[in-house]
Amino acid sequence: MNIPIPYVMEQTRYGERSYDIYSRLLKDRIIFIGDEITDTLANSVTAQLLFLASTDPEKDISIYINSPGGSVSAGFAILDTMLYIKPDIQTICTGMAASFAAVLLVGGTKGKRCALPHAEVMIHQPHGGMKGQASDMDIYAQRILKQRKEINHFIAERTGQTPDKIATDSERDYFMSAAEAKDYGVIDNILPV
């Protein structure tokens, strides 16, 4: 089911202008990740990050996250761009940051990673399905184990937890409330409502 995208009207010196809500938020340097992380979403978010960095490399960018996660490679495309560009990135979890969305949340600039009071964070090991020849399945299994190690080390580095603790906690779905995510080091602040 496609949910219609809201439009907002804004008065300019040239008259009234209509924006879809995401374009209007982008004017205020706000990016919203509110869906599964796919290549299409990653390309859009990456383009927005690059655009905002080129227009003002000194001004913060805010990324609001309410996502179940998704593709690891698409997630890394967003994460690497966040880390590559000059502006600080404020990340805000507004509902759920699960799987790679949690990695994006923790990937924000330290001191600027936030959640709303009822937000949840979930970390787990990468998922994947395999079929085909045994040699192909072995290649895929090695790839997913490498990704898991990279993700665990990144989360450990950003949270202050040990890689072994991250590996143990993410063996299965590991849910955290906003307060628990703050104690764990995923976020720095819980925003008041």
Swiss-Prot record:
Catalysed reactions listed for this entry: Hydrolysis of proteins to small peptides in the presence of ATP and magnesium. alpha-casein is the usual test substrate. In the absence of ATP, only oligopeptides shorter than five residues are hydrolyzed (such as succinyl-Leu-Tyr-|-NHMec, and Leu-Tyr-Leu-|-Tyr-Trp, in which cleavage of the -Tyr-|-Leu- and -Tyr-|-Trp bonds also occurs)
Matches recorded under Pfam families: CLP_protease (PF00574)
GO cellular component: cytoplasm; endopeptidase Clp complex
Catalytic center residues: 99 (nucleophile), 124
EC number: 3.4.21.92
Main subcellular location of this protein, as a coarse class: cytoplasm
Listed Gene3D superfamilies: 2-enoyl-CoA Hydratase, Chain A, domain 1
GO biological process: protein quality control for misfolded or incompletely synthesized proteins
Entries under InterPro entries matching the protein: ClpP, ClpP/crotonase-like_dom_sf, ClpP/TepA, ClpP_His_AS
Subcellular location: Cytoplasm
Molecular functions per Gene Ontology: ATP-dependent peptidase activity; ATPase binding; serine-type endopeptidase activity
Any coiled-coil regions, as ranges: none
Keywords: Cytoplasm, Hydrolase, Protease, Serine protease
HAMAP family reported in the protein's UniProt record: ClpP (MF_00444)
Main function: Cleaves peptides in various proteins in a process that requires ATP hydrolysis. Has a chymotrypsin-like activity. Plays a major role in the degradation of misfolded proteins.
Subunit-level organization: Fourteen ClpP subunits assemble into 2 heptameric rings which stack back to back to give a disk-like structure with a central cavity, resembling the structure of eukaryotic proteasomes.
Family named by the database record: Belongs to the peptidase S14 family.
Annotated protein name in UniProt: ATP-dependent Clp protease proteolytic subunit 1
Organism field: Shouchella clausii (strain KSM-K16) (Alkalihalobacillus clausii)
